């Protein structure tokens, strides 16, 4: 069957649209230093995510799911470049169709070598030569940009995880805001409170949140890069720091590091909101305090009890501090929960629901202190900071 030349030109026009769409996605994703909406990369992310949800849907063990989900980001990157190259292949094949003698299969056979192998094509005519040269150039540029993109991703990932690892050393893991305050005051049993280090901590995490907001909205696959340890997550780490700032501002308004804590909170909930919107979630810019939060007053009391175990100084009564804590947490809870659920972050205390509803929150791990007795045997003893809180 001979396809009319007019129909071939219509197909060529469709090919131009495919090439332009794919090129726009490549430029927006790999070159433009800001979050650029691309339906192609968004659909690839949704498709890969759906596959991983299907694979992990019946995996009950969180550690096993974490091992599977560790490959999620890499799969997104591979499928992303595959989608671009396939669209270029189909697009240039349709563009070539009016210039070749034969059917559409001949056009595909001519366009393929131009994209995959430099100089492997034999053009017939000036128009065909120009099309194949452009196809070859675009194929090389796309692969080169994707390769150059990887060091940028891993540099941002390493900066992010450096902050998470330092927080784990201070607060344990999975991270929890009250635990951060308790351990900071307890100071590893030194007898000298290190609460005076909180201003520096909040200043560091203000910068950390700003860096993550910029990098993770510009390079969205970073959101799905998981921490090296299964019980660590950048989402729960930031949530922990924000909860600790909200707690200390609510409980100790006169002695808290007000400016660093407020700036950290502002940078933190802006980070959560920006990343959540980049992922496609509809989160309010200014949440209504009357919405309430998922943390109950009883769980808030459990947190205060945890602080009292280590004699953390508290100025206000719980019933007076509670409204202020709610007012702070409502700013970031919805966005944080949306991201945590989407990436299946470790179910830390106060970090919201996950897809697997039967999964219980995991309290921070607190190893016992081992001391050698006179008989040479180790006798584990619990520190005040090593008691387990209520898993609210």
Functional labels for PLM-detected ranges:
Residues 1-9:
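Short, strongly hydrophobic alpha-helical membrane anchors
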Residues 3, 58-76:
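Cytosolic juxtamembrane amphipathic/interface segments immediately preceding
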Residues 10-31, 92:
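N-terminal signal-anchor transmembrane alpha helix
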Residues 18-22, 77-162, 243:
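Pore domain of cation channels
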Residues 30-59, 159-175:
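Membrane-interface amphipathic/juxtamembrane segments adjacent to transmembrane helices
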Residues 40-55, 107-115, 119, 130, ...:
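Hydrophobic alpha-helical segments of integral membrane proteins
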Residues 162-238, 243:
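Non-transmembrane accessory domains of multi-pass membrane transporters/channels
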Residues 171, 201, 223-226, 230-392:
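Soluble C-terminal extramembrane regulatory/interaction domains of multi-pass membrane proteins
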């Amino acid at each position: 069957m001979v396809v009319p030349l007019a129909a071939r030109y219509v197909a060529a026009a469709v090919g131009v649209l495919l090439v332009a769409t794919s090129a726009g996605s490549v430029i927006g994703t790999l070159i433009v230093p800001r979050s650029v909406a691309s339906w192609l990369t968004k659909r690839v992310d949704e498709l890969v995510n759906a596959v991983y949800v299907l694979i992990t849907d019946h995996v009950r063990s969180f550690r096993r799911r974490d091992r599977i989900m560790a490959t999620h980001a890499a799969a997104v990157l591979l499928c992303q470049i595959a989608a671009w190259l396939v669209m270029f292949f189909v697009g240039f094949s349709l563009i070539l169709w009016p210039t070749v003698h034969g059917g559409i299969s001949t056009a595909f056979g001519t366009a393929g070598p131009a994209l995959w192998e430099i100089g492997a094509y034999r053009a017939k005519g000036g128009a065909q030569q120009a099309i194949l040269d452009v196809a070859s150039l675009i194929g090389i540029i796309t692969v080169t940009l994707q390769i150059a993109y990887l060091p940028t991703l891993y540099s941002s990932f390493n900066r992010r995880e450096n902050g998470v690892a330092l927080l784990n050393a201070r607060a344990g893991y999975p991270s929890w805001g009250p635990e951060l305050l308790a351990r900071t005051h307890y100071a590893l049993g030194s007898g000298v409170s290190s609460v005076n280090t909180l201003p520096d901590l909040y200043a560091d995490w203000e910068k950390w949140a700003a860096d993550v907001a910029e990098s993770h909205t510009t390079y969205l696959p970073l959101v799905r890069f998981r921490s090296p340890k299964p019980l660590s997550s950048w989402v729960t780490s930031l949530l922990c720091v924000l909860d600790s700032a909200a707690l200390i501002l609510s409980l100790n308004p006169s002695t808290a590091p007000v400016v660093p804590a407020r700036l950290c909170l502002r940078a933190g909930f802006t980070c959560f909101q920006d990343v959540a919107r980049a992922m496609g979630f509809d989160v309010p810019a200014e949440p209504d305090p009357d919405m309430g939060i998922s943390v109950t007053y009883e769980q808030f009391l459990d947190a205060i009890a945890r602080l009292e175990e280590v004699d953390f100084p508290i100025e206000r009564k719980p019933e007076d501090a509670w409204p202020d804590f709610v007012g702070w947490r409502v700013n970031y809870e919805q966005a944080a929960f949306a991201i945590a659920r989407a990436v299946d972050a470790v179910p830390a205390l106060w970090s919201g629901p996950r897809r697997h509803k039967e999964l219980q929150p995991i309290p921070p791990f607190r190893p016992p202190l081992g001391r050698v007795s006179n008989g040479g045997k180790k006798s584990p003893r619990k520190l005040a900071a090593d008691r387990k809180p209520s898993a609210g």
